[in-house]
Regions:
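Polytopic transmembrane helical bundles with strong interfacial aromatic enrichment
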Residues: 1-119
Length: 119
């Protein structure tokens, strides 16, 4: 999770800069907002993955394994679909965005449950 979290964080910074400096002139304001949401949620969950990666060394791996894998899938589906929608021509991918959001929420809830179960 440390590796994927680090990669997601780097991509978030790269995409944020790309959006601010290159896409600002190319996308509508609505498309830019969607692109920024995708970038923001990717960054938030990169921190989550980094936390899960570090906690994997402190706690048992089973506490972070399922939530971490779900978080990776959630970021790819949620942010990935928003990137495609914002860049135009891929509006149908917007239908899967809520699935990615539900997977992200569920990853945090499973993590909370695993922590609760351990204590």
């Amino acid at each position: 999770f440390l590796l994927v979290g680090s990669i997601f964080a780097a991509l978030s910074i790269l995409f944020g800069a790309f959006g601010a400096h290159f896409l600002k002139e190319k996308l509508s304001s609505d498309q830019l907002v969607v692109f920024e949401i995708a970038t923001r949620y990717m960054m938030y969950h990169s921190f989550g993955l980094l936390i899960f990666g570090l906690l994997g060394y402190i706690l048992t791996e089973e506490i972070v394994s399922a939530p971490g894998m779900m978080m990776i899938v959630g970021v790819v589906v949620f942010s990935g679909s928003l990137y495609l929608v914002s860049l135009g021509g891929f509006k149908k991918f917007g239908m899967i965005t809520p699935i990615g959001g539900v997977v992200l929420i569920t990853s945090w809830l499973i993590f909370a449950y695993n922590i609760y179960k351990q204590s």
